[in-house]
Regions:
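Short, acidic/small-residue loops that bind anionic groups at enzyme active sites
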Residues: 1-16, 55-56, 62, 69-94, ...
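Acidic/glycine-enriched connector segments
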Residues: 1-54
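C-terminal functional extensions of proteins
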Residues: 81-138
Length: 138
């Protein structure tokens, strides 16, 4: 952050206390720590109205994907936030969550998912920025 300071946006990095391999992001303007990972995950999903990018992960990442799918489906907080699965091979072949969720949405089992699959950082940025244009700010 010292090399590339910015004051336009505020962001929050929330690595879990439990897993040492999840370091804080150097790009966040603020850092928080939770001692209970499930509380951390729920908090992140609750406040992430601007979107979430899922990179290849393990059990916790899968839980977050489905937790957020439920929040978006029911519009639990009055808004559905965009979600991007980054890593086409991982999310379609290694851990084929994307095709399953996409099919459930097409069949009407899930709604409001706003789910994108991409390997392209520019496309991902565009998806998130385009969503920001639709949010009515007071």
């Amino acid at each position: 952050m010292h090399r590339y300071p910015q004051t336009k946006y505020v962001s929050l990095g929330v690595p879990t206390w439990l897993y040492g391999h999840e370091p804080s992001t150097p790009l966040a303007t603020h850092i928080a720590k939770y001692f209970v990972n499930s509380v951390r995950e729920d908090t992140i999903l609750t406040i992430a109205f601007g979107g979430i990018i899922y990179t290849p992960g393990s059990a916790g990442t899968l839980r977050e994907i489905f937790q957020n799918a439920v929040q978006n489906h029911y519009l639990s907080f009055g808004i559905a936030s965009p979600r991007v699965c980054m890593g086409k091979q991982f999310w379609t072949e290694d851990v084929p969550v994307y095709p399953m969720i996409h099919q459930m949405e097409e069949r009407g089992r899930y709604k409001n998912l706003l789910l994108t699959l991409s390997d392209d950082p520019i496309e991902i940025e565009t998806v998130l920025k385009d969503f920001q244009k639709t949010i009515p700010y007071e």
